Design a protein with these regions (language model features):
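Conserved catalytic or regulatory cores that recognize and/or transform ribose-phosphate-containing ligands
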Residues: 1-156
Length: 156
């Protein structure tokens, strides 16, 4: 199952944390696309914004699930956009199984009660997926969706 791993990528810590999580996903038979591990083509002369959009949008469109890192006082704006794109694509594509968000940041409290995270973005996640508090929970959910995808393929 192809998974798009959305999350903030602006600090060394953020990139290392996402890469570390991706290693665990791969060790569990999952196939995450991690944007910073997939560099843009050096001969592409378009603007950085256009290259980033095209590369990441294509990866989102090809993915069967999304994992979104939503730690911090606010959901990263790029991550929120990617969540919205995947949610919209899910409405017409039965091979897309859902969005699982990883929120293990105790500073922002519980997922549903008084949390300052954007309600619209959280609503997108909750309508088609789940918010997990640990990477282990994330892996369980992604494996369940992977099993569902395999059953769907066998039924065709």
């Amino acid at each position: 199952m192809k998974i798009y791993f959305a999350g903030p990528l602006f600090t060394v810590y953020e990139r290392e944390y996402i890469s570390k999580c991706a290693v665990s996903l791969r060790e569990n038979g999952l196939h995450p696309f991690v944007p910073h591990e997939n560099p843009m083509k050096p001969d592409d002369t378009r603007s950085l914004a256009q290259r980033c959009l095209d590369k990441d949008f294509n990866a989102i469109a090809e993915s069967n699930a999304m994992l979104a890192l939503i730690n911090g006082p606010e959901i990263d704006d790029g991550t929120a956009c990617e969540i919205g794109i995947f949610y919209a694509l899910m409405q017409k594509d039965s091979t897309k199984k859902g969005i699982v968000a990883l929120h293990d940041d105790w500073r922002t409290g519980g997922v549903s009660e008084g949390k300052p995270l954007n309600a619209f973005v959280v609503g997108c996640i909750e309508k088609v997926g789940v918010i997990c508090n640990s990477l282990e929970e994330v892996i369980q959910q992604l494996n369940a969706w992977s099993d569902d995808l395999q059953k769907d393929r066998e039924a065709r």
